[in-house]
UniProtKB/Swiss-Prot annotation:
<feature type="active site" description="Charge relay system">
    <location>
        <position position="499"/>
    </location>
</feature>
<dbReference type="Pfam" id="PF08530">
    <property type="entry name" value="PepX_C"/>
</dbReference>
<dbReference type="GO" id="GO:0004177">
    <property type="term" value="F:aminopeptidase activity"/>
</dbReference>
<feature type="active site" description="Charge relay system">
    <location>
        <position position="349"/>
    </location>
</feature>
<dbReference type="InterPro" id="IPR000383">
    <property type="entry name" value="Xaa-Pro-like_dom"/>
</dbReference>
<dbReference type="Pfam" id="PF09168">
    <property type="entry name" value="PepX_N"/>
</dbReference>
<comment type="subunit">
    <text>Homodimer.</text>
</comment>
<keyword id="KW-0031">Aminopeptidase</keyword>
<dbReference type="InterPro" id="IPR029058">
    <property type="entry name" value="AB_hydrolase_fold"/>
</dbReference>
<comment type="function">
    <text>Removes N-terminal dipeptides sequentially from polypeptides having unsubstituted N-termini provided that the penultimate residue is proline.</text>
</comment>
<feature type="active site" description="Charge relay system">
    <location>
        <position position="469"/>
    </location>
</feature>
<protein>
    <recommendedName>
        <fullName>Xaa-Pro dipeptidyl-peptidase</fullName>
        <ecNumber>3.4.14.11</ecNumber>
    </recommendedName>
</protein>
<dbReference type="InterPro" id="IPR008979">
    <property type="entry name" value="Galactose-bd-like_sf"/>
</dbReference>
<comment type="similarity">
    <text>Belongs to the peptidase S15 family.</text>
</comment>
<dbReference type="GO" id="GO:0008236">
    <property type="term" value="F:serine-type peptidase activity"/>
</dbReference>
<dbReference type="GO" id="GO:0008239">
    <property type="term" value="F:dipeptidyl-peptidase activity"/>
</dbReference>
<keyword id="KW-0378">Hydrolase</keyword>
Length: 760
C-alpha cells in the first residue's frame, strides 16, 4: 500500500479542535500531547465498557504495550506516535511491518509527527485511509460512533454516513419529455427510479443516466452483430460535408392535474456502489434509462440529442420545469419537493457518455458530472479514420447493435406486441444512416458528436479514464478534456487500467475527493477543498499517482525507424484467416510475438522517453492495389514488471459504504512481470490519409505520405527499454477482415515516429 492523499483539507488548530469536539473527541488544548493522544485512543474503543483492555492490545514500543506506556512517565515520541497510528489504521506489527520507519517511508505516510501539532495530527489521522480502504472516521461511523439521525454531519469538508439506509424511500415517477421519438403523436414518458433517505432537508441528487438499467436484450444484440469478414470498399473520391444542427425540443404545456400521493414503488435496482456511498451521506440516488427502455416510451435513438433530452427532462423536473406523473395513466402529477434541484451525474461507459452529452446542453441544475470511461464522439467509438473499427473486445458491434441491446421495451411482451413493427422500421432507418459500408463520417455521426458543443459546458467536470481502455479509447477523454472551457473547474484521473471503475482502489482516495467536491457543489459547504486538475497513475511503479499540468504537449521528439523497405502482406492462408477470425485473441498473441503479417521495428532507447499526448507515425507508404488499410501498435516490449490492466480484489468486503451498508471489495492494479505492454494503437483507411472529410484515391504502387495519429497516452519509458513499432493491415479485433491479395510497402528511410514529450 502507498498513500496518495488528495482529499485531505489542511485545517487550522482551532477548526481541527472544533471538528473533533463535534465528533465527541473532547480534547483539551492545554493538555500534553501524550494525554491528548491517550484520550483520543480511548474514544476509539467506544464499544468497550473498559478501554484499558483494547488499549493493552496495542503496542507503543517493541517492548511496551500502549496501556503500560500511558501509565508510565515516558514522554510521547515520534516512534511511539507512528507505531500507534499505524495500528489504529489496521496495520499489524510483525505481520504488515517489522521496522516502522521503513514501512512509513514505503507507505509515503502523510503525517509527520510534531508534538506541538498533536491535535492537527489526530484530525489528519481520522481523515486518513485505513488498511481496509476506508478512512478512519468512516470506519468509526460505520461501527456506530454517530447515530443515523438523517441529518448532515461533516468532517474535514466531507459528509459522514449518518443517513439511515435501512429506511430508504424507493419510488417511481414518469417524467414527460419534450420528445416524440417513436412518432406516435404522444410525448415520451421517462421512467425514473428514485432512492432517497428520509430527511426533513432538501436533498441533492446523484443521477445515473443508464440505458442498461431497465434490462438488456442480449438475444437481439447477438442476432444483429455484423460479420467482420468483408472486402475493404474502394470509395469514390469526394468531400464530406456536415452541418451543426441545434436540437429543438417539442412544446409542452403546464400541468394542471392534482398532486398524487400514491407512487409506484420498487424493492431493488442494480445500484452503483459510489452512489450507495453518497446515499448514506444524504444524497438521493436516481436511475434513469431514457427513451426506448422498459417502463419508458419512445424509440432508442442511441447517442443523439433526443436521447440526451430524455435525461435532461429529469433534471428539469427536479427543478420544477417539467412534469412527472404517478403512472402512465397520467391522472396525477408529482413534484420533486424533496430535492434541492442540484444534480451530479455518475457512471461509466455509456452512462458517463450520457453525462458528457447532458453537460453540453448547459442545463440549469446540473452542477457536476463524474464521467468515467466516457465517449465524446460516437464516430470515434465505432469508426476510425474512414474505417469501420469495432471497440476493443466487441468485433461486429455497431450503434444499431447497441440499440437492439438497450431497446428494453421489447423485453415487455405487451410492448413488443404493440410497438415492435414500428421499432423495426426506425431501427432499419438507423442501420442505413450509420453507413457501415464506407466507414465515413456523415451527418448521422455528427449529430452524435458532443465535442462540437463542449463550449456550452458550465458545470464542474470530473473524468476518469484508463490508458489501457481499448473499448472506449483514450482519444475520447483526450479530446473532450482539452475542449472544455477554461472558465469551468475540470479534473481528470488517468489510470493504467482498462475499462474499469476506480472508486474502490487502495492507492487513490477518489471516493473521499468526490465527497469533498460534492459537498462544495451540491450542498454549498465552504470547505476550501482544491483538487488538482489532472492526476496520473505512474506506469513505472505500483501505487504512485502524480499531478500533471496537461494531457498532450507540443514538445516532440522524432525517432527514426530505419533505412529498409518493408513489405506488409495483407493476405493470409485460408486456415490461418479462419482461425484468427474465430479468435481475435490468438491473432493478437501472434502479432505481439512477430508471427502475424507485419513490419516490425524495435527501438532501443538511449534515454528516458516520457510520452504525453498523441504519438504520430509519419510514413512513406505505397499499396499494390487501389485500396489499403493501415494498422499500427506501439509496445513497451521486453520482460519487466508492469502494472496489470485489471484491478484485483485485495479484500472481499472491507469497504462499508454506510453503516453496514453496501459493502464492496478493496481493489488495486497488480504489479507483476510480463512480456509487453501496449502503449498505443491506431487504424486508418488510406483513402482518408489527409483528413476525415476528404476521400482520396490510392494510386497503385505510388508513394504516399501518411500521418497516422495514435491513441493519446501518458507513459514513461526508461533508458534501456525497447519500444516496438508494429505496422500491419487487418486487425482481427478492430477492423474489417479483408483477405484480398494486396501488400503495403513502407520506406523506413523517409518515415518517423513523432513522440510528444512531457516536460519536467
Amino acid at each position: 500500500m502507498r498513500y496518495n492523499q488528495f482529499s485531505y483539507i489542511p485545517t487550522s488548530l482551532e477548526r481541527a479542535a472544533e471538528e473533533l469536539k463535534e465528533l465527541g473527541f473532547d480534547l483539551d488544548l492545554q493538555k500534553t500531547a501524550k494525554a491528548s493522544l491517550e484520550s483520543f485512543l480511548r474514544k476509539l474503543f467506544f464499544h468497550y465498557p473498559d478501554s484499558d483492555y483494547p488499549l493493552s492490545h496495542l503496542i507503543a514500543k517493541n517492548d511496551m504495550d500502549a496501556l503500560s506506556f500511558f501509565q508510565s512517565e515516558q514522554e510521547l515520541s515520534k516512534e511511539v506516535f507512528d507505531l500507534l497510528a499505524l495500528q489504529v489504521l489496521g496495520f499489524i506489527p510483525g505481520v504488515d511491518f517489522t521496522e516502522a520507519d521503513a514501512f512509513l517511508d514505503k507507505l509515503a505516510f502523510p503525517i509527520h509527527f510534531d508534538e506541538t501539532e498533536i491535535i492537527k495530527h489526530i484530525h489528519h489521522l481520522l481523515a486518513t485511509r485505513c488498511k481496509s480502504g476506508m478512512t478512519l472516521i468512516d470506519d468509526l461511523v460505520s461501527q456506530g460512533m454517530l447515530t443515523m439521525d438523517n441529518d448532515y454531519h461533516f468532517f474535514n469538508g466531507k459528509s459522514l454516513a449518518t443517513f439511515d439506509t435501512s429506511q430508504l424511500i424507493r419510488e417511481v415517477v414518469y417524467v414527460e419529455a419534450p420528445l416524440d421519438t417513436d412518432q406516435d403523436g404522444q410525448l415520451d414518458l421517462i421512467k425514473v427510479n428514485i432512492i432517497r433517505p428520509q430527511s426533513q432537508k432538501p436533498l441533492p441528487t446523484l443521477m445515473t443516466p443508464s440505458p442498461y438499467h431497465q434490462g438488456i436484450n442480449e438475444v437481439a444484440n447477438d442476432k444483429k452483430l455484423y460479420r467482420m469478414e468483408k472486402e475493404l470498399v474502394v470509395k469514390k473520391r469526394r468531400q464530406i460535408t456536415v452541418e451543426d444542427r441545434d436540437f429543438i425540443p417539442l412544446e409542452t404545456q403546464p400541468c394542471k392535474l392534482p398532486i398524487g400521493q400514491n407512487l409506484e414503488s420498487f424493492s431493488y435496482i442494480n445500484s452503483y456502489s459510489l452512489n450507495d456511498y453518497f446515499l448514506a451521506r444524504g444524497f438521493a440516488n436516481i436511475y434513469v434509462s431514457g427513451v426506448g427502455t422498459a417502463g419508458s416510451t419512445g424509440f432508442m435513438t442511441s447517442g443523439n440529442y433526443a436521447q440526451i433530452e430524455s435525461f435532461k427532462a429529469v433534471i428539469d423536473w427536479l427543478n420544477g420545469r417539467a412534469t412527472a406523473y404517478t403512472s402512465h395513466s397520467k391522472t396525477h402529477q408529482v413534484r420533486a419537493d424533496w430535492a434541492n434541484g442540484l444534480v451530479c451525474t455518475t457512471g461509466k461507459s455509456y452512462l458517463g457518455t450520457m453525462s458528457t452529452g447532458l453537460a453540453t446542453t448547459g442545463v440549469d441544475g446540473l452542477a457536476m458530472i463524474i464521467a468515467e470511461s466516457a465517449i465524446s464522439s460516437w464516430y470515434n467509438y465505432y469508426r476510425e479514420n474512414g474505417l469501420v473499427c469495432s471497440p476493443g473486445g466487441y468485433p461486429g458491434e455497431d450503434l444499431d447493435v447497441l440499440t437492439e441491446l438497450t431497446y428494453s421495451r421489447n423485453l415487455l411482451a405487451g410492448d413488443y406486441l404493440r410497438h415492435n413493427d414500428r421499432y423495426q422500421e426506425l431501427l432499419n432507418q438507423q442501420s442505413q444512416a450509420l453507413d457501415r459500408q464506407s466507414g465515413d463520417y456523415n451527418q448521422f455521426w455528427h449529430d452524435r458528436n458532443y465535442l462540437k458543443n463542449a463550449h456550452q459546458i458550465k458545470c464542474d467536470v470530473v473524468y476518469t479514464h484508463g490508458l489501457q481502455d481499448w473499448n472506449v479509447k483514450p482519444r475520447q477523454v483526450y479530446e473532450i478534456f482539452n475542449a472544455l472551457p477554461s472558465t469551468i473547474n475540470k479534473h481528470l484521473f488517468l489510470h493504467q487500467g482498462e475499462h474499469v471503475y476506480m472508486h474502490n482502489w487502495q492507492s487513490i482516495d477518489f471516493r473521499e475527493s468526490m465527497n469533498a467536491l460534492l459537498c462544495q457543489k451540491l450542498l454549498g459547504l465552504a470547505n476550501d477543498f482544491s483538487l488538482p486538475e489532472m492526476i496520473w497513475q505512474d506506469n513505472t511503479c505500483p501505487q504512485n499517482w502524480q499531478e500533471r499540468k496537461v494531457f498532450g504537449t507540443s514538445t516532440i521528439k522524432e525517432l527514426d525507424l530505419g533505412q529498409e523497405l518493408l513489405l506488409i502482406d495483407n493476405h493470409y492462408g485460408e486456415d490461418e484467416f479462419k482461425a484468427y477470425g474465430k479468435d481475435f485473441r490468438a491473432f493478437k498473441a501472434a502479432l505481439f510475438k512477430g508471427k502475424a503479417n507485419q513490419a516490425l521495428i524495435d527501438i532501443l532507447l538511449e534515454e528516458d522517453l516520457p510520452i504525453n499526448g498523441e504519438i504520430v507515425l509519419q510514413l512513406k507508404v505505397k499499396s499494390s492495389e487501389n485500396k489499403g488499410l493501415l494498422s499500427a501498435q506501439i509496445l513497451d516490449y521486453g520482460k519487466k514488471k508492469r502494472l496489470g490492466d485489471l484491478p484485483i480484489a485485495l479484500t472481499q468486503s472491507s469497504i462499508d459504504n454506510g453503516q453496514n451498508f453496501s459493502r464492496e471489495p478493496l481493489k488495486e492494479l497488480p504489479f507483476r512481470e510480463d512480456s509487453y505492454r501496449v502503449i498505443s494503437k491506431g487504424f486508418m483507411n488510406l483513402q482518408n490519409r489527409n483528413n476525415l472529410s476528404s476521400i482520396e484515391t490510392i494510386p497503385n504502387n505510388k508513394w504516399m505520405t501518411v500521418r497516422l495519429p495514435l491513441q493519446p497516452t501518458i507513459y514513461h519509458l526508461e533508458k534501456g527499454d525497447t519500444l516496438r513499432v508494429i505496422l500491419y493491415t487487418t486487425d482481427f479485433e478492430h477492423t474489417v477482415r479483408d483477405n484480398s491479395n494486396y501488400a503495403l510497402t513502407i520506406d523506413l528511410s523517409q518515415s518517423q515516429l513523432i513522440v510528444p514529450i512531457a516536460s519536467n
